[in-house]
Regions:
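Penicillin-recognizing serine hydrolase domain
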Residues: 31-36, 136-261
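Intrinsically disordered, low-complexity sequence elements enriched in Ser/Thr/Gly/Pro
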Residues: 1-2, 56
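Active-site-adjacent loops and short helices of periplasmic peptidoglycan-processing enzymes
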Residues: 23-177, 186-190
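Sec-dependent N-terminal signal peptides of Gram-positive bacterial secreted proteins and lipoproteins
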Residues: 2-24
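Hydrophobic alpha-helical segments, especially transmembrane helices
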Residues: 3-5, 66, 242, 258
Length: 261
């Protein structure tokens, strides 16, 4: 089995990584890192390759959606055939927030699988909120409670979510190490890694005014798409999730395999 490096490039400047605290001194690096919090793990052995402020609280921005994916996947049995209607009341909640959006529209009828792709590939806050509203039976706060319950179940020690998308809130935080625990679990779920490694996602709404009309979405992850930024593209990287806003800075969770490691 090839050994996988698990760089969670999180919390400020891009091109750093994260992982668990125990044994963090196992490896030394000969370059300076600039991210505020980092954890890098070998997934085959759970060996810590490097860590920096891995237990410090940080806002995770859209890497929050990894937990949103987990909760949705565990609450909905049939992702491909469960359909959700997008309502004006839900999407209007994001007006004026500067959100990243997938472009879903009022009265679209989409499958949960389509919404998960819309959430993870272009980092659509709109898709995240629609899913949370649907599973929470009109109350996204009920969905957020499920997110926090799952974080505790996974052993997260310093994580608290207040929304399903990652917009700024002083009480919305996690750590590099907790985000590692969350992502490692997400990678065990069906569809997660395949969805997160896409550079493009094309779909057609199953119902609504634009039913059958094709739409194509583009990843926000510059590590995996050479067309976005050749200088940041890293051909050994796979997925997973970007995030950014003024308070969080630039966040990234990713994996990479090179030379058998």
């Amino acid at each position: 089995m090839k050994k996988k490096l698990f760089p969670i490039l999180c919390f400020f400047l891009v091109l750093c990584c994260m992982l668990p605290q125990a044994g963090a001194a196992t490896f030394n690096i000969d370059f300076e890192t600039y991210s505020a919090a980092i954890e890098l793990v070998n997934l085959d052995t759970d060996t810590i390759v490097y860590e920096k402020n891995a237990t410090a609280r940080r806002e995770p921005a859209s890497t929050t959606k990894i937990m949103t994916f987990i909760v949705v996947s565990e609450q909905i049995q049939d992702l491909d055939n469960t359909q959700v209607t997008v309502t004006k009341e839900v999407v209007d909640q994001l007006l004026g927030t500067g959100s990243s959006l997938s472009g879903i529209k009022e009265n679209d009828v989409l499958t949960v699988m389509q919404l998960l792709n819309c959430m993870m590939v272009p980092s659509g806050n709109d898709a995240a909120l629609v899913l949370a509203d649907y599973i929470g039976n009109g109350d996204s706060n009920a969905f957020v409670e499920l997110m926090n319950e799952k974080a505790q179940e996974l052993g997260c020690q310093d994580t608290h979510f207040t929304n399903p998308h990652g917009l700024h809130d002083d009480e919305h935080y996690t750590t590099a190490h907790d985000l590692y625990l969350i992502t490692k679990y997400a990678m065990s779920l069906p569809h997660f890694t395949d969805i997160c490694d896409q550079t493009r996602y094309t779909y057609t709404p199953v119902g609504g005014p634009e039913a059958g009309q094709q739409r194509t979405l583009v990843t926000t992850n510059r590590l995996i798409d050479p067309n976005l930024d050749p200088d940041l593209y890293y051909r050994y990287a796979r997925g997973i999730k970007t995030g950014s806003h003024d308070q969080a800075g630039y966040c990234l969770v990713s994996t990479a395999t090179r030379g058998g490691y």
